[in-house]
UniProtKB/Swiss-Prot annotation:
Dependence of activity on temperature: Optimum temperature is 60 degrees Celsius.
Biotechnology: Industrial production of acrylamide is now being developed using some of these enzymes.
UniProt cofactor(s): Co(2+)
Enzyme Commission code(s) on record: 4.2.1.84
Reaction equation(s) it catalyzes: an aliphatic primary amide = an aliphatic nitrile + H2O
Biological function: NHase catalyzes the hydration of various nitrile compounds to the corresponding amides.
GO molecular function: cobalt ion binding; nitrile hydratase activity
One GO BP annotation of this record: nitrile catabolic process
Record-given protein name: Cobalt-containing nitrile hydratase subunit alpha
UniProt: Co(2+) binding residues: C108, C111, S112, C113
Note describing how the cofactor binds: Binds 1 Co(2+) ion per heterodimer.
Quaternary structure annotation from Swiss-Prot or TrEMBL: Heterotetramer of two alpha and two beta chains.
Length: 204
């Protein structure tokens, strides 16, 4: 795995993917299956209408509004709808809260079920067989070795297996020292990885 298959050459992987996508895009346009305007619209959707920035919006709302947090943990899909967030791959979302006693991490062992509306497209490592199998067997060791995140021995780790029926999202703990911060400032601390559970929200 870590030659680093999880974290390994994100740049290299990205270059390969970009080249393949461009080749496929050109072929589909040439065959009249897609148009450039259709492709631009899809890019706009994934840039502005779904993605981690929307997940961060949900997290910050939960950090700053206790009543919203209760609703989010009770029914994540409906609570997200309050913020205008939902849609494809977001029909059934369950949010699980990190606390001083327990840390949650998400995987999809069968395929790559993933809450697109709040996290965007899944990172490559999330779909790797090595991540999917190892996080179930030895989550503490994997988080430390692959993501540089050491969960204290006293803290329980729970692994949640997403499926087409239920997609899990982690509500990270709010970092200390952020009292009085604006929602915009708090949102900068929330990462896609922290909502999957492979790292905490950014420290202040």
């Amino acid at each position: 795995m870590t030659e680093n298959i999880l974290r390994k050459s994100d740049e290299e992987i990205q270059k390969e993917i970009t080249a393949r996508v461009k080749a496929l895009e050109s072929m589909l346009i040439e065959q009249g299956i897609l148009t450039t305007s259709m492709i631009d619209r899809m890019a706009e959707i994934y840039e502005n209408e779904v993605g981690p920035h929307l997940g961060a919006k949900v997290v910050v709302k939960a950090w700053t509004d206790p009543e919203f947090k209760k609703r989010l943990l009770a029914d994540g899909t409906e609570a997200c709808k309050e913020l205008g967030i939902g849609g494809l791959q977001g029909e059934d979302m369950m949010w699980v809260e990190n606390t001083d006693e327990v840390h949650h991490v998400v995987v999809c062992t069968l395929c790559s079920c993933y809450p697109w509306p709040v996290l965007g497209l899944p990172p490559n490592w999330f779909k790797e067989p090595q991540y999917r199998s190892r996080v179930v067997r030895e989550p503490r060791q994997l988080l430390k070795e692959e993501f540089g995140f050491e969960v204290p021995p006293s803290k329980e780790i729970k692994v949640w297996d997403s499926s087409s029926e239920m997609r899990f999202v982690v509500l990270p703990q709010r970092p200390a020292g952020t009292d009085g911060w604006s929602e915009e400032e708090l949102a900068t601390l929330v990462t896609r990885e922290s909502m999957i559970g492979v790292e905490p929200a950014k420290a202040v």
